[in-house]
């Protein structure tokens, strides 16, 4: 079991009552709940407002993607991958490298947004990323264009396989990976 750090803090009475009802008096469950809520805020919630991120029902997203052509979705993904996602990654991780790009897709796209199921395999030179989503070809085109734009910016070769229900992205290092530092100095 992981070593825990003890902290003492006060919570509002209505939050305490809801938490007690949810965990039914089990201390361990209360600790897990609090850790999960804090982790969710630290890894996701505090960035939602700054970048105007939202979590949407996958059925709604499937409907949205069905109203875009594959080329329109690909263009949106390319624009997003060349601007907003780079800014988000630099803000969130304070660096822009392959690991931060993949972690963004894994944590933000899969774990918190539930936009797709993420799987990854490979080594330092070659990676295969699979995003399973069941939202149509346009969703694959969007995610593929975004991931490709980010990877190419890092000096990597990318091969995409897009289907109606998933994107397979094969990334290969060409030479030395390029990394981009944030524009603003890190706060001390």
State the predicted function of each range.
Residues 158-188:
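Short terminal or interdomain "cap/linker" segment that borders an active site or interface and mediates
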Residues 1-13, 20-23:
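Short Lys/Arg-rich basic patches
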Residues 12-15, 45, 49-62, 70-75:
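Charge-rich, low-complexity segments
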Residues 28-51:
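Short, basic amphipathic alpha-helical segments that act as recognition/interaction helices
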Residues 18-20, 43:
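Juxtamembrane and targeting peptides
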Residues 58-129:
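An N-terminal amphipathic alpha-helical segment
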Residues 109-165:
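Short, hydrophobic/π-rich interface segment
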Residues 5-7, 127, 165-169:
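Short beta-strand micro-motifs in enzyme catalytic cores
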């Amino acid at each position: 079991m992981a070593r825990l750090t003890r902290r003492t803090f006060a919570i509002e009475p209505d939050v305490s009552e809801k938490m007690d009802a949810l965990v039914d008096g089990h201390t361990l469950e209360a600790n897990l709940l609090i850790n999960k809520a804090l982790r969710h805020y630290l890894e996701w919630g505090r960035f939602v407002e700054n970048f105007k991120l939202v979590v949407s029902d996958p059925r709604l997203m499937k409907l949205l993607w069905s109203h875009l052509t594959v080329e329109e979705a690909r263009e949106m993904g390319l624009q997003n991958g060349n601007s907003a996602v780079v800014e988000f990654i630099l803000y969130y991780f304070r660096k822009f490298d392959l690991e931060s790009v993949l972690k963004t897709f894994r944590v933000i796209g899969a774990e918190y947004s539930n936009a797709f199921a993420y799987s990854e395999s490979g080594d330092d030179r070659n990676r295969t990323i699979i995003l399973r989503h069941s939202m149509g070809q346009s969703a694959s085109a969007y995610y593929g264009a975004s991931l490709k734009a980010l990877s190419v910016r890092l000096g990597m070769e990318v091969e995409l396989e897009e289907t109606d229900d998933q994107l397979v992205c094969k990334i290969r290092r060409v030479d030395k990976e390029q990394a981009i530092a944030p524009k603003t100095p890190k706060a001390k």
